[in-house]
Every structure is written in structure tokens, then in C-alpha cells.
């Protein structure tokens, strides 16, 4: 088991998209009231006084969509200023990134992952939900803005949905040819989208690699980061390709992260709804910080047993009742 030193912090459960795999339009969601969401100061307290003393050095801000939170730049600046923080990154849909990229970079953010599930605007809108207007062009402009500002590495996340965008995999891989972009293909997961998952299933990463291999060739590669991706490269390309195979190639033994939801629940495993602890209530009830730190330490000791290992079938096993946006992907 790897040392657990990586915390993913969900800043908000809301999003300006309704992606099929994260916040399906069919899902009847009850969003958190503002009073239920961790404040910026509470997040800073947990990072500084609970997680850093336990050996956490790497942090990623997620959602929902983190950029819809008004104080996102301030939160980035406060965490980035902590001397023990070795790496601070963010996952975003980039819809608001054009106007925020420079401020985020100036605040100390250096790495960013952007969701880009299709190069075809109509398919992209089918996946993310239009809410009355197309979204692709503004996302593409946000990606370009992040590239100009200097985020490095700049990673593009592609959730591969059979029959929807899987035919685009070679074209998406080609984005790595002429730019230092890192394209990551993620197997479709059964998180709050059972109606889609049972119908469509998932495509193993090895099959995706073979499609790229047939068109471009493929060699092993490397890119800086904290994730479980297996990294490859098209020969001669400036960027790389990553494959996150949580369904077909279990990587529980390599897991180095825990997740903090927007309402303060610490979750040791994305695919297991047991073993969570409520840190927000402890903070607001003035539980001594040493006690909160000990609760987290004890949870980390249990993490190897909590990690979900039943990925033999996409339709077998537990039902996942919370959406990815509620968990904090």
C-alpha cells in the first residue's frame, strides 16, 4: 500500500454542467445549503492543522465545479502559501477558466486538469448537458487560456462512454502530438449513473490503447502527477497519454489519496461508501484539533481494508447512490 499523502478537496457540490457520468440530468439532487459547505477558513484549518501534520503534501481542488465558488482564488492562495504544501492542483470543466486562469496562476496554482470529453460540439453538449446553450467553444477557449498562462502539465480528462465518444479516442489522442498536453482516458464508472452504466458498460483501457496503437503507434511515457494513470506516448509527440483503468485494471494497491467532500466528510475510497468521518461537525463543535487529527490517522490505518476491490464486473456488487459531484471526484 502506498503512503497516503494526497487529499482531494471538493469546494462545492454545484456545477454549471450536468455531465452524464457525474451529475446526470435525470438525478434528483438536493444541493447543499451554503451553511453546510466548508468555509475557506475551515478548509485551511483542516489542511494546515490536520492533514499536513499527518504527512499530506499534495492537494487537489475539485467539485462539483470549483470555479463557481466565489472565493476559489483566495482558497488557492492560502493553501499555496503553506510552506509544507509540495503540490496544489485543480480539476475544472474550464467553462469559467478564460477569465480566471491568470488569477489562479498568480495565486499559486500550477497544475490543472480539464474535462474535455469530445471534440465534436454536438457530442460534447450531449455529454455535459446544454441547459439551453452550447458549451464547447467556451471550454476550448478556457483550455487555450490555461495553456497561454503556463499551467504545466496541462491535462485533459476524457471519460470514455461506449457508443457516445469512444470513436473519438484516436483524434483526442492526437491533441498530444504538437502540444505539451497530456490526454487522460478514464474508464466509465458506476457512480450515481446506474441507468447509463448498466446499458453502456465500459471499454477496457487496453482496447483504447490498441486503437491508438493501430493508428499512431504507442510507447511508454512519463508525466508529473499524483494519479493512478498508466502513461504512454505517441512516438515523437510532445505530450503524453494516460489511462485510468479503475474498472479493468484494479489499482487499489497503488491508491495514495482520500477525498474531502464539500460538506466536510472524509472518504477513504471512491467506490466504497463505508468508513467516512465527519470533520466539519467536529470543527464547528470545537472538538480539539488533535482529536480530529487522530480520527483521520485511525481512518488511514483502515484504508487498505476499505478500498474497493470488486471490479470484476461493471454491473455486479454495490449500488452507488451518491453522484460523483456529491462525493467530490
UniProtKB/Swiss-Prot annotation:
Task: Cite the Gene3D superfamilies for this sequence.
Answer: Aldolase class I
Sorted UniProt keywords: 4Fe-4S, GTP-binding, Iron, Iron-sulfur, Lyase, Metal-binding, Molybdenum cofactor biosynthesis, Nucleotide-binding, S-adenosyl-L-methionine
Q: Tell me the residue numbers annotated for binding S-adenosyl-L-methionine.
A: 21, 64, 115, 189
Note describing how the cofactor binds: Binds 2 [4Fe-4S] clusters. Binds 1 [4Fe-4S] cluster coordinated with 3 cysteines and an exchangeable S-adenosyl-L-methionine and 1 [4Fe-4S] cluster coordinated with 3 cysteines and the GTP-derived substrate.
Q: Where is the Radical SAM core domain?
A: 1-229
Q: Which residues bind GTP?
A: 8, 60, 91, 155, 257-259
Function in brief: Catalyzes the cyclization of GTP to (8S)-3',8-cyclo-7,8-dihydroguanosine 5'-triphosphate.
NCBIfam families recorded: moaA
State what protein this is by name.
GTP 3',8-cyclase
> Gene behind this chain?
moaA
Amino acid at each position: 500500500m502506498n503512503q497516503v499523502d494526497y487529499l482531494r478537496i471538493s469546494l462545492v457540490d454545484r456545477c454549471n454542467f450536468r455531465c452524464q457520468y457525474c451529475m446526470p440530468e435525470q438525478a434528483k439532487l438536493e444541493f447543499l445549503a451554503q451553511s453546510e459547505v466548508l468555509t475557506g477558513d475551515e478548509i485551511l484549518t483542516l489542511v494546515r492543522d490536520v492533514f499536513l501534520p499527518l504527512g499530506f503534501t499534495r492537494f487537489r481542488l475539485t467539485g462539483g465545479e470549483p470555479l463557481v465558488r466565489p472565493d476559489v482564488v483566495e482558497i488557492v492562495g492560502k493553501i499555496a502559501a503553506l510552506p509544507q504544501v509540495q503540490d496544489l492542483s485543480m480539476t475544472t470543466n474550464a467553462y469559467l477558466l478564460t477569465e480566471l486562469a491568470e488569477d489562479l496562476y498568480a495565486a499559486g496554482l500550477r497544475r490543472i486538469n480539464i474535462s474535455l470529453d469530445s471534440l465534436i460540439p454536438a457530442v460534447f453538449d450531449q455529454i455535459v448537458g446544454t441547459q439551453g446553450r452550447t458549451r464547447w467553444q467556451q471550454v476550448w477557449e478556457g483550455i487555450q487560456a490555461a495553456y497561454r498562462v503556463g499551467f504545466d502539465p496541462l491535462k485533459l480528462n476524457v471519460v470514455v462512454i461506449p457508443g457516445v465518444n469512444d470513436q473519438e479516442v484516436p483524434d483526442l489522442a492526437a491533441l498530444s502530438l504538437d502540444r505539451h498536453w497530456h490526454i487522460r482516458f478514464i474508464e466509465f464508472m458506476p457512480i450515481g449513473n446506474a441507468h447509463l452504466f448498466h446499458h453502456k458498460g465500459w471499454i477496457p483501457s487496453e482496447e483504447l490503447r490498441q486503437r491508438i496503437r493501430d493508428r499512431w503507434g504507442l510507447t511508454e511515457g512519463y508525466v508529473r502527477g499524483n494519479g493512478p494513470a498508466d502513461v504512454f506516448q505517441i512516438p515523437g509527440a510532445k505530450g503524453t497519454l494516460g489511462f485510468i483503468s479503475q474498472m479493468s485494471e484494479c489499482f487499489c494497491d497503488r491508491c495514495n489519496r482520500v477525498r474531502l467532500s464539500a460538506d466536510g466528510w472524509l472518504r477513504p475510497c471512491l467506490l466504497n461508501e463505508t468508513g467516512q468521518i465527519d470533520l466539519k461537525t467536529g470543527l464547528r463543535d470545537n472538538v480539539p484539533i488533535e482529536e480530529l487529527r487522530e480520527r483521520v490517522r485511525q481512518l488511514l490505518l483502515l484504508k487498505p481494508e476499505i478500498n474497493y476491490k470488486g471490479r470484476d464486473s461493471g454491473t455486479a456488487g454495490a449500488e452507488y447512490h451518491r453522484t460523483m459531484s456529491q462525493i467530490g471526484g
